[in-house]
Amino acid sequence: MLTITLLGTAATMPLPDRALSAAFAACGGHGLLWDCGEGTQAAAHRAGVNLMRADAICLTHYHGDHIFGLPGLLQTLGAQGRTRPLALLGPEDLPDIWAAVRALTGPLPYPVKPQVLMPGQPLALDALSEGWPAGARLVPFATKHRVKSLGYRLELPRAGKFSPEQARALGVPVQQWKMLQKGQSVAVEGRTVQPAQVLGAPRKGLSVVFSGDTAPCPYYLQAAHDADLLICDATYALPEQEDQARQWGHSTFGQSASLAAQARAKRLWLTHYSPMITDPEEYAAQAQSIFPAAECGFDGKSITLQYEEAQP
């Protein structure tokens, strides 16, 4: 299962009930932090999210409302006793950003490993930590903002159903079943047994897309296809603001809803609201008229996604 929590839903400036952009994806004892705007730590405390679980911080771009919480968070993780490595992921210019952040934090008691990601080049999450499910990956995609920017699709695939009968027929000891279930081959009496020999057809996994700041674009639509949850830019509320949204590299409520409908996503959370939007719920009906499963995000909003069982 996969738990997603919105930590910050504000754009440009924090408000009393809205921290700046951040969301956390938790899977077992591991997690990913998407963006790290001002107020991320306090928002995580309020939401009961333990940021020590993060294996990586995934930055969509380097505007201040998405990264100004980073120096403080890195220092806090050190003060809390972190020693294991932390990946810092993002688009081009990450080395310059990391140099500036490191100058602010000073030495840290754990290694931070910056890594530039390129659109369309997946990152296997077991490269960050062995605790992720087999095949879990993070897929960056190009977005349409005023600077180089990325969105992220998190994918947790699910292997086919394990057949104990077939494993026994092949002489696999019970102690080795778990390895096959994790997608690893095993040696049995001088021969190799492959996972495909004891697993059924792959089952539907889970996928979550975090758009960052973006106007609608083909790469975003492709990445959003069949996602269980889209977390989407909704900086502007009204249809008549589409030209303004395009100019600044953002989306309206209606545009994000249209994209979710085209992508056949299951759920849409709107986020990254302009300070001019005092109550996002006032505009929710606009999005829901296009995509009924649209919801207004808020700081602390959370959902646990479960694997779907095949219908008989």
Residue ranges and their predicted role:
Residues 15, 130-222, 229-231:
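Active-site-proximal loop/helix segment associated with metal-binding centers of metalloenzymes
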Residues 70-77, 100-101, 278-286:
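Metal-dependent catalytic neighborhoods of phosphoester/phosphodiester hydrolases
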